[in-house]
Amino acid sequence: MGTIKIVTDSSITIEPELIKALDITVVPLSVMIDSKLYSDNDLKEEGHFLSLMKASKSLPKTSQPPVGLFAETYENLVKKGVTDIVAIHLSPALSGTIEASRQGAEIAETPVTVLDSGFTDQAMKFQVVEAAKMAKAGASLNEILAAVQAIKSKTELYIGVSTLENLVKGGRIGRVTGVLSSLLNVKVVMALKNDELKTLVKGRGNKTFTKWLDSYLAKNSHRPIAEIAISYAGEASLALTLKERIAAYYNHSISVLETGSIIQTHTGEGAFAVMVRYE
């Protein structure tokens, strides 16, 4: 039986111990801050990137990993005896990373199945972790691909932003439907679905977020949850408030983590994401 390994990109928000335990390969994106290039993997310390972004003269710019880095990553895995690679990446609505991964696989001439997770952050983690667990347990490539697709189809990702400034400056506002770019200081909740950010609600103050969540939980209370996660940019207080509200409906552990530099660049400070995988 061959060896299958899972590759993903650093837009994933995941506990470091899981990466190690499941032997997941994470290819880093890059962030340019005031003409200095940082590897996303070097910005994982809590609050580090946000402090750099707040002090920068202009909005940081993210860039996908070079094609050559993907090619090198895949070649190195094959040299170690890996027979199949499954690469799971963030939505093309947010980055061209998936295309760089495909091109890297072609250059390396290695057996790579490149998948669009449809998401990013911890919603992508749901797929990556399950795939890695299955690979370790000796599942076949087809079994892993089927499981990843099933998880993707049952996952929902909701993003709340406190300012649209980063989305506007980063050129992502065109992919956010139903929002006037002039309303920069409005609170907005969006869903990432079918590689598009779609506005659900907008308003003033954090009550916009809590009211949306209460309504969402009530409407979906009949649906059994497999796992749920919350990510945040900046202070954790809002994320912890949301966690308390979710706990009334879901009595299992809820992962609350700071999102990485790639997502924070797009969302700005004060943002959060609620990600749910249903049974």
Curated annotation (Swiss-Prot):
**Which Pfam families did the record assign?**
DegV (PF02645)
Among its keywords, does the record have Kinase? no
Q: Which UniProt keywords apply?
A: Lipid-binding
Q: Which residues bind hexadecanoate?
A: 62, 95
GO molecular function of the protein, one example?
A: lipid binding
InterPro entries in alphabetical order: DegV, DegV_C, DegV_domain_contain
- NCBIfam families per record: DegV
Q: What is this protein called?
A: DegV domain-containing protein SpyM3_1149
**Originating species:** Streptococcus pyogenes serotype M3 (strain ATCC BAA-595 / MGAS315)
**Lineage of the source organism?**
Bacteria, Bacillati, Bacillota, Bacilli, Lactobacillales
